[in-house]
Each structure stands twice: as structure tokens, then as C-alpha cells.
Regions:
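Short polybasic amphipathic segments
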Residues: 90, 108-121
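A non-catalytic, amphipathic alpha-helix used as a structural packing/dimerization or gating element
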Residues: 32, 138, 159-162
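Contiguous beta-strand/loop segments that form the cofactor/metal-binding neighborhood of enzyme cores
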Residues: 34-107, 130, 137-151
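A short glycine-threonine-serine/GTX helix/turn-capping micro-motif
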Residues: 21-28, 125-134
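Active-site/binding-pocket entry motifs
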Residues: 5-9, 98, 106-107, 123
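Short acidic, glycine-rich loop/turn motifs
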Residues: 68-72, 116-123
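C-terminal helix-rich "cap/oligomerization" subdomain common to oxidoreductases
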Residues: 71, 128, 145-182
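Predominantly a Rossmann-like dinucleotide-binding segment in NAD(P)-dependent oxidoreductases
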Residues: 1-57, 177
């Protein structure tokens, strides 16, 4: 599984560039990549190795790459950046085929998301379009329903804590230069 997720923002007034509020690429958008891997593999990484480039002025991760090992041959390679051209993908490659999701995390308002599906042994790509939606309005609605007890939340605080442990392991690996075990 490969997940690049990048955007450009070098505004010192933006909280995503503030070290004191856990800004930077890993905290801001790396969590989306980690979540994608955990949901797809239905597991938590066992080991991680990471490389991080800090912005000299902000002291936040402006570029981070990590390899997350979920065991049993399941790996997620992610690259996130807050100072690169806007780009995002999720690519899943396996023995039976592959799936590529264009703009999986935040497509432009109302824009459809395209899925490309290829079966093993075929060069043909099947295209599936997911209709556009206002994802932020949907998130607010889902939150309101959860607060009112109408529906469960999509993720728990325990789930968020697991993601944070994975992200902190990426930082520890980048600092130590070694694989970190979770």
C-alpha cells in the first residue's frame, strides 16, 4: 500500500505550521495515511521506520516518509508534506489486482472521486466514480448524530491514541535511525 499526501502552506500564522500545536506533516496529514493503512489491513503496525525533514523556521515536519510493517507481508509506504505540490493517492497492490483512489482524503468541493480497479492478469482498468459531496458537512452531521446518541462514532479516542503512538514511533525512528517496534 502506498499513500502520498501533500499540500503547500508555508504561512507562519497557520496553526498547522506551529510546533506548539503539534503542527507539521505527520500530525496534520500523516494521521490520515496511518488510518487508511489500519482500516485496510484491519491491524496496527508492528514496526515502523521513518525519515523526517524539519522546516528550519517552524521546527515542524515539512516532509516525512515512513514504512509501516503490519506483519504477514502487509506494508504501508507513506510520504506526507506541507511544502510540496498538492497531491494525494491511495494505491493498493496485491496478488489479485490493484485499486488506485484519486483524491481519497479531500477532493475539491463537490468533485467526484475516481477509483481505478485492475484485476491480476489484465491490462484493463475499470473506472468507478464516487459522487462528490461536502465532506465537512457530512462530518459535522455524523458528529451531531453521535453526540445525540443516534449513531456510533466512526473512530474512538482509543483509535486516535493508537494513531498517535504510530506517529510518535515514526518520529522516534527518524531520530534514532532505527526501526521502532510498537
Amino acid at each position: 500500500m502506498q499513500v502520498p499526501l501533500c499540500y503547500f502552506d508555508d504561512d507562519p500564522a497557520n496553526s498547522r505550521n506551529a510546533a506548539k500545536t503539534c503542527g507539521g506533516a505527520m500530525y496534520d496529514i500523516g494521521c490520515s495515511c496511518v488510518t487508511a493503512g489500519r482500516w485496510f489491513f484491519e491491524a496496527t503496525p508492528q514496526r515502523v521506520i521513518g525519515m523526517i525533514d524539519l522546516d528550519p523556521a517552524f521546527q515542524t515536519a515539512r516532509l516525512a516518509s515512513a514504512l509501516l510493517d503490519f506483519g504477514a507481508g502487509r506494508q504501508l509506504a507513506l510520504t506526507v508534506s506541507t511544502q510540496a505540490v498538492r497531491y494525494q493517492r491511495v494505491q493498493l497492490v496485491g496478488t489479485l489486482g490493484r485499486i488506485e483512489i484519486e483524491t481519497p482524503f479531500n477532493p475539491a468541493d463537490g468533485a467526484a472521486t475516481r477509483y481505478l480497479i485492475q484485476s491480476a492478469g489484465s491490462t484493463e482498468l475499470r473506472v468507478v466514480m464516487l459522487p462528490g459531496a461536502n465532506q465537512y458537512a457530512l462530518q459535522c452531521d455524523a458528529f451531531a448524530h453521535a453526540v445525540r446518541g443516534k449513531t456510533p462514532t466512526a473512530a474512538s479516542l482509543d483509535d486516535a491514541a493508537i494513531n498517535l503512538r504510530v506517529i510518535e514511533a515514526v518520529f522516534a525512528s527518524a531520530k534514532s535511525g532505527r526501526v521502532e517496534t510498537l
